[in-house]
């Protein structure tokens, strides 16, 4: 629907040009940016291949041996009888890495806007596990028929949402009294060395069309969440990467949703040589990620 709206507006603008009407070029540029970003995200998240490349780098080279997904699971404080919803589940890694820790008497609904992602998650978890169900929907329009939940999880999801406030308000509607919302993000220092690396090779490269942490990040997340939730607290995941092999880092870079694939293929050999040299003695990458833990505001209307 969003893409159809953007494309209709572009057609209307083209018609205005042909009729020699005044064109709002600022609005036009915003729409072009939105079109490029949305199509990029759609291509990136049709299935789990690109997201797996990003997760793989963290799995191989994180200094903290606990691991991101086991740590997230610990913050969830899951216990018997809980009804849980994950928004934007991706390939289901949060659950495949924690299956043995989950009690038997719980129900977990995995959701994603991408049917391809859900297929990958179902395949990874196993479609026969009665604790799990899989639903495709946009988190801006959470179906009321799903019922209410003790816990809602949004792992690195909110900064992709067009209307974060609307998503938060929808979450409050499906949380039970005393229910919790766990949403992860990162800050301005997160993976900064990777961006500096590619820009030292070609300053035109940007690994993200937007600075996602400016949309929803560690620095501004409390202000964004506070109108909808109470007792909003931030917990950092203490970690860093020491990358000692070029290929996983290159795969990570190529999987990002920026413009790198416009500039790297023609000079791939030179870029690979640069990354290989940087990783020979261990390439340090800062991680600045964590979670906001929120409780429902009972009187929100």
Language model features with spans:
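Class I SAM-dependent methyltransferase SAM/SAH-binding core
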Residues: 85-141
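A short SAM/SAH-binding and catalytic strip from SAM-dependent methyltransferases
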Residues: 1, 151-164
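Conserved Class I S-adenosyl-L-methionine
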Residues: 9, 14-25, 29-32, 65, ...
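A short glycine-rich, Lys/Arg-flanked "PGG" loop and its adjoining helix->strand segment in the class I
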Residues: 165-180
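A short acidic, Gly/Pro-enriched loop at the edge of an enzyme's catalytic core
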Residues: 140-152
């Amino acid at each position: 629907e969003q893409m159809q709206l953007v494309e209709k507006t572009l057609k209307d603008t083209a018609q205005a040009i042909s009729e020699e009407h005044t064109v709002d070029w600022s609005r036009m540029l915003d729409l072009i940016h939105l079109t490029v970003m949305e199509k990029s995200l759609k291509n990136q998240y049709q299935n789990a291949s690109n997201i797996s490349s990003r997760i793989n780098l963290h799995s191989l080279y994180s200094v903290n041996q606990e691991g991101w997904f086991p740590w997230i699971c610990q913050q969830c404080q899951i216990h018997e009888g809980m009804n849980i919803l994950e928004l934007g589940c991706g390939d289901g890694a949060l659950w495949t890495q924690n299956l043995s820790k989950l009690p038997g008497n719980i129900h977990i609904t995995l959701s994603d806007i991408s049917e391809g992602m859900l297929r990958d998650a179902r395949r990874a978890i196993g479609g026969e596990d009665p604790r799990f169900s899989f639903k495709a929907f946009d988190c801006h329009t959470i179906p009321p028929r799903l019922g209410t939940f003790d816990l809602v999880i949004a792992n690195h999801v909110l900064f992709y949402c067009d209307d974060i406030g609307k998503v938060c308000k929808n979450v409050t509607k499906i949380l039970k009294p005393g229910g919790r919302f766990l949403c992860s993000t990162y800050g301005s220092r997160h993976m900064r060395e990777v961006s500096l690396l590619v820009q030292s090779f070609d300053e035109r490269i940007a690994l993200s069309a937007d600075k996602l942490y400016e949309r929803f990040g560690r620095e501004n997340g409390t202000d964004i969440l506070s109108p909808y939730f109470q007792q909003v607290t931030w917990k950092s995941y203490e970690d860093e990467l020491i990358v000692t092999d070029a290929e996983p880092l290159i795969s990570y870079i190529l999987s990002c949703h920026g413009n790198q694939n416009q500039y790297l293929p023609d000079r791939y050999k030179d870029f690979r040589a640069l990354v290989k040299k940087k990783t020979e003695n261990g390439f340090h990458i800062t991680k600045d990620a964590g979670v906001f833990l929120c409780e429902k505001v009972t009187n929100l209307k």
